[in-house]
Amino acid sequence: MTDLKHLASVIEQAFEERASISPATVSSEIKNAVLDALAALNNGSARVAEKVDGSWHVNQWLKKAVLLSFRIWDNQVIDGAESTFFDKVPMKYEGYTQAMFEADGVRVVPGASVRTGSFIGKNVVVMPSFVNIGAFVDEGCMVDAWATVGSCAQIGKNVHLSGGVGIGGVLEPLQAGPTIIEDNCFIGARSEIVEGVIVEEGAVISMGVYIGQSTRIFDRETGEVHYGRVPAGSVVVPGNLPSACGTYSLYAAIIVKKVDAKTLAKVGINELLRAVSEE
């Protein structure tokens, strides 16, 4: 069993000396520590962020391990079905057999790109999309066509990422937290959730909603404005809020209602959003 505390210690020290590290100069201890950290990310035994006592905790040393990996790997030719590629990070499913896919319990559709160092849980369907290093996609998710799960992004159980969705990645600055989509969320087509925003459990994001840290998230029922966090059970659509002078308006994400898990399961996403548009 990998000693994560020891790995963290080696990675932290190596990161302070990263300017002097290259494929030619890296020590076997540092190289093995980085590879072990990536293996832990790859199999899900470690993750960049995890919920502890109701709050998200970021394991910064794992982000540092990912950054160090770019210093210890040379670019190399990667063979693909339709083309040849040249990159530092190998593909997660390179060399996988049918038995290995069946053991993992995942479906990976041709055209999907999943990098080593990311975790894909059981019963996940990965359509032609991109999952970056350090990302964690929990069980039962749909990663639909042309969606992007950025570096170190955390996707909870039973999340639906619709076509063209962008979930932002973060490696630097180190103090920045990853973008997090909690369990049982729905992210509508072409929406973008970035810059470490947290979408809490059971939220429904309509098509074409863009949320970063500076985006106003306005609750029309309470008048409250949130930043960087979509409250649990929120149904969110794109909208605008007027300026103080009343001469212009600026984009905002609008919370039009709240739903619980029971209502969400009973009504369904399409009916819920259709009802919102008719209000």
UniProtKB/Swiss-Prot annotation:
GO terms for cellular component: cytoplasm. The keyword Heme does not apply. It catalyses: (S)-2,3,4,5-tetrahydrodipicolinate + succinyl-CoA + H2O = (S)-2-succinylamino-6-oxoheptanedioate + CoA. SUPFAM superfamilies: Trimeric LpxA-like enzymes. It is an enzyme of class 2 (transferase). Keywords: Acyltransferase, Amino-acid biosynthesis, Cytoplasm, Diaminopimelate biosynthesis, Lysine biosynthesis, Repeat, Transferase. Pathway: Amino-acid biosynthesis; L-lysine biosynthesis via DAP pathway; LL-2,6-diaminopimelate from (S)-tetrahydrodipicolinate (succinylase route): step 1/3. It is found in: Cytoplasm. Pfam families: Hexapep_2 (PF14602), THDPS_N_2 (PF14805). Its main location: cytoplasm. Its EC number is 2.3.1.117. PANTHER family: 2,3,4,5-TETRAHYDROPYRIDINE-2,6-DICARBOXYLATE N-ACETYLTRANSFERASE, ACETYLTRANSFERASE. This is 2,3,4,5-tetrahydropyridine-2,6-dicarboxylate N-succinyltransferase. It comes from Colwellia psychrerythraea (strain 34H / ATCC BAA-681). The lineage of its organism: Bacteria, Pseudomonadati, Pseudomonadota, Gammaproteobacteria, Alteromonadales. The gene is dapD.
